[in-house]
């Protein structure tokens, strides 16, 4: 669901709330875009929005030439990196990547990129470069571009979050506190704020549950076609963990605490649906490297292009594309 890294688009979805829903909504400019393909490009319709993109996570059909053009790399280099990557993912060295290995690797990638995002976001907010973030700096980042009618309310919401994560009460946020801000599931106070705002936006009858009807009504902007409605129903079911027809507070808590788990589960379904027994062998990986090169196992190709951004993971290759002085949104553009 949508994190700071996401670039807002046209419609909204429940997911974004679970990484940093409110701050995603308030963000004036988004300096990070590494998760734009499927990573949390969602937000509530009461806020601002982005279409669900889980369906886009399936492996696309690209020629080697087209892939090389998009990645700004040559085909030979891509293929070599893919083979090296296979060996990293295949932890038991049986020349097969199974569902569990794919899941573990994807979680490792997401955790590494999240830490990178936190550092980049901290630098973007800390305008005076003093190593701390003040309330005014946070407001300047997340409030300034909003409609004047909503400005005061949004300032209050930002201030509430600021005070919640300012654990030492010094009126400033350090990197560890910004890390909490971007991961509300790790802080009880922040999670309560998130849950209440989710319910305020979605729970129309005040029973502290979100039905599929409420979900679709809130998510829909204008009339929805059958395909869009079906996708929303599918998305709703993925949040309704006990399948009782409603998303309750306990389910919200579970998803907020571990948003990556939910997303990886959805992506894994797409990734494995066309694989025999849900596995991919080294021979198939090499033969169909173009497709796997833009799958969840490469973070849609980002791992191949910008391995240094994944802190804590040692890759046998380095960034291949010259990194010019541009915004991260340009650097990590969608494939």
From Swiss-Prot:
Chief location bin: endoplasmic reticulum
Domain EF-hand: 113-148, 153-188, 190-225, 227-262
Amino acids binding Ca(2+) 2: 166, 168, 170, 177
Binding of Ca(2+) 1, residues: 126, 128, 130, 132, 137
Record flagged with keyword Protein biosynthesis: no
Disruption phenotype: Gene knockout results in slower parasite proliferation represented by the formation of smaller plaques compared to their parental counterparts. Lower invasion capability. Longer duration before egress from the host cells. Reduced parasite gliding motility and average trail length. Reduced virulence in mice. Loss of the regulatory ability of Ca(2+) efflux. Impaired Ca(2+) storage in endoplasmic reticulum. Impaired microneme secretion. No significant differences in in vitro replication.
Cellular component aspect of the GO annotation: cytosol; endoplasmic reticulum membrane
Alphabetized GO MF terms: calcium ion binding
Short sequence motif Prevents secretion from ER: positions: 332-335
Membrane disposition: Single-pass membrane protein
Signal peptide coordinates: none
Pfam families tied to this protein: EF-hand_5, EF-hand_7
Function (record text): Calcium-binding protein. Participates in the efflux of intracellular Ca(2+) and storage of Ca(2+) in the endoplasmic reticulum. Required for gliding, host cell invasion and egress. Required for microneme secretion.
PANTHER family: CALCIUM-BINDING PROTEIN, RETICULOCALBIN
Name of the protein: Calcium-binding protein TgpCaBP
Annotated organism of origin: Toxoplasma gondii
């Amino acid at each position: 669901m949508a994190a700071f890294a996401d670039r807002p688009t046209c419609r909204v979805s429940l997911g974004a709330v679970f990484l940093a829903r409110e701050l995603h909504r308030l963000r004036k400019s988004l300096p990070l875009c590494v998760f734009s393909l499927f990573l949390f490009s969602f937000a509530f319709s009461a806020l601002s929005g982005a279409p669900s993109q889980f369906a886009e996570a399936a492996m696309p059909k690209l020629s080697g030439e087209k892939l090389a053009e998009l990645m700004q790399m040559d085909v030979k280099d891509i293929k070599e990196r893919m083979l090296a990557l296979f060996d990293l993912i295949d932890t038991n060295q049986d020349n097969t990547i199974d569902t569990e290995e794919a899941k573990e690797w994807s979680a490792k990638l997401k955790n590494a990129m999240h830490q990178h995002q936190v550092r980049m976001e901290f630098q973007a907010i800390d305008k005076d470069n003093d190593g701390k973030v003040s309330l005014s700096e946070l407001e300047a980042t997340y409030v300034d571009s909003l409609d004047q009618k909503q400005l005061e309310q949004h300032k209050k919401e930002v201030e509430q979050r600021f005070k919640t994560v300012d654990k030492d009460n010094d009126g400033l946020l350090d990197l560890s506190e910004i890390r909490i801000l971007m991961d509300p599931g790790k802080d009880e106070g922040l999670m309560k704020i998130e849950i209440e705002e989710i319910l305020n936006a979605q729970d129309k009858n005040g029973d502290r549950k979100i039905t599929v009807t409420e979900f679709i009504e809130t998510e829909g902007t204008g009339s929805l076609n059958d395909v869009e409605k079906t996708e929303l129903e599918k998305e709703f079911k993925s949040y309704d963990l006990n399948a009782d027809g409603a998303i309750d507070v306990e389910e919200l808590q579970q998803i907020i605490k571990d948003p990556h788990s939910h997303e990886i589960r959805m992506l894994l379904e797409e990734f494995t649906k066309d694989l025999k027994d849900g596995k991919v062998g080294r021979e198939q990986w090499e033969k169909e490297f173009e497709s796997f090169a833009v799958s969840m196992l490469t973070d849609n190709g980002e791992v191949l292009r910008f391995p240094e951004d994944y802190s804590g993971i040692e890759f046998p290759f380095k960034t291949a594309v010259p990194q010019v002085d541009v915004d991260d949104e340009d650097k990590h553009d969608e494939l």
